[in-house]
Regions:
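Multi-pass alpha-helical transmembrane bundles in non-GPCR membrane proteins
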Residues: 5, 9-246
Length: 246
């Protein structure tokens, strides 16, 4: 896999992630990107990123009395919050590759964790989940290298989405399809999020600052629905004889 590195004083980042459309901070141009002396470079993209961090704050508050009982959800919360915070700083300032890493690395790790978790729930042995997920994530990096720019990034998100949604039918069936709305609604939100991410620059005639901010908003809604489903699953394990009705 071809992978050239660009150096900065802070960190080395491979070109394979970004393609030819990046600017000085290593990230791509968006419809809203206008490098000026303004304090906030991309206000819509920056403030909408808070929608990603919001579910992390909500569920941290929700499990505050018994956090250790919800160990997996608790482990996911920092990555979700860092993703939202990193996206806010990245889009707002466009000055640091550290913020760029915070924009996508927590999401990458979080997607991997949840995908392995769902496959481990669906398959007889937990290690089978790791075996099922590994080639998918190798494919994700491969497609970013094959398709430059935003197209490759969007394709990688699509692959990740399919990977962690695939085992959910077995999990839904196990719990009599309770909370199906979370999975259906979350899937629709993630599909819409990727769609709006893809058409960001094509939609400027309708929305002058593009549609990337809708990627953040629908991702935040989808993250909330998914976190709520993780909360539900854990409650089923804690109270197997008194399963909650969706």
């Amino acid at each position: 896999m071809a992978c050239n590195f660009r150096k900065s004083n802070l960190v080395e980042i491979p070109d394979m992630f970004f393609g030819p459309e990046q600017i000085l901070d290593g990230g791509p141009w968006y419809a809203e990107t206008h490098i000026t002396d303004n304090l906030i470079v991309e206000p819509w993209n920056a403030f909408s990123s808070l929608a990603i961090a919001a579910p992390a704050v909500y569920f941290l508050w929700k499990i505050r009395k018994e956090p250790t009982q919800y160990a997996f959800l608790l482990a996911c919360i920092p990555f979700l919050f860092l993703n939202g915070l990193g996206s806010t700083l990245f889009h707002g300032l466009r000055t640091s590759r550290i913020f760029l890493l915070m924009d996508f690395m927590p999401a990458l790790i979080l997607t991997l964790l949840i995908t392995v978790y769902f496959w481990a729930k669906a398959l007889p042995k937990w290690w089978m989940g790791i075996l099922a997920v590994t080639p998918v994530f190798l494919m994700r990096f491969g497609i970013i290298d094959l398709i430059p720019g935003q197209g490759g990034i969007n394709a990688s998100y699509t692959i990740s989405g399919i990977a962690f949604l695939a085992p959910l039918f077995l999990i839904l069936r196990k719990y009599d399809f309770k909370k199906s709305f979370n999975i259906i609604g979350g899937s629709i939100c993630f599909i819409l999020a990727i769609y709006f991410r893809q058409i960001d620059k094509q939609a400027v005639d309708i929305i002058p600052f593009g549609t990337h901010f809708l990627w953040h908003i629908f991702s935040g809604i989808g993250a909330f629905l998914l976190a709520d489903y993780l909360y539900f699953l854990r409650n089923q394990e804690l109270r197997p004889s008194k399963r909650e009705i969706a």
